[in-house]
């Protein structure tokens, strides 16, 4: 049978962006093991590679129209799973303050569950510019804690993580304020 004009096929779930997302999930335990074993250079390398796949899968999905329902759900789960794992591992094996992890995890899980609920009700909540800044700050902060750096870098690493926490909270509040405006 031929294609019906005006009808577009949904992309298959078996596509490059979804494979990259799945690989990110599969490699989280490898990252955690390396960090818990204090193989900081290797853990840093795996973390950076996994974060790059996050950027890459999104770019490929948008460029080639390979956005799928699986990707909409699995990608944010993979992102949060990696970041939460990294934060918890740094609490256990390094000197990242626990309060930072608690604040970030509560916000990430809360907003992610809310976005999933909105998606389930056919409302896509796109990532905000502030959310992208938050992700960059969290990524850089975690990378600084993972990277074997001289002790004089402890203060700059801490400052980046404090900024990440502040932006995490502010963007979380902003999502809720924006949602309230939409619902009113």
Language-model regions: role of each:
Residues 1-184:
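Alpha-helical transmembrane bundles and membrane-interface segments of multipass inner-membrane proteins
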């Amino acid at each position: 049978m031929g294609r019906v004009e005006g009808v577009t096929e949904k992309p298959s779930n078996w596509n490059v962006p979804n494979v990259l997302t799945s690989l990110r999930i599969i490699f989280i335990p490898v990252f955690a093991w390396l960090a818990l074993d204090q193989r900081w250079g290797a853990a840093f390398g795996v973390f950076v590679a996994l974060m790059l796949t996050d950027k890459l899968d999104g770019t490929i999905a948008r460029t080639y129209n390979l956005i799928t329902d699986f990707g909409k759900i699995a990608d944010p789960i993979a992102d949060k799973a990696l970041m939460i794992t990294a934060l918890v591992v740094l609490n256990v094996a390094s000197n990242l303050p626990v309060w930072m992890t608690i604040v970030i995890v509560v916000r990430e899980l809360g907003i992610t569950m809310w976005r999933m609920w909105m998606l389930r009700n056919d409302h896509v909540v796109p990532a905000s510019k502030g959310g992208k800044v938050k992700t960059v700050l969290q990524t850089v902060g975690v990378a600084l804690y993972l990277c074997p750096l001289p002790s004089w870098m402890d203060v700059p690493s801490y400052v980046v993580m404090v900024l990440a926490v502040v932006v995490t909270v502010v963007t979380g509040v902003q999502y809720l304020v924006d949602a309230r405006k939409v619902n009113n």
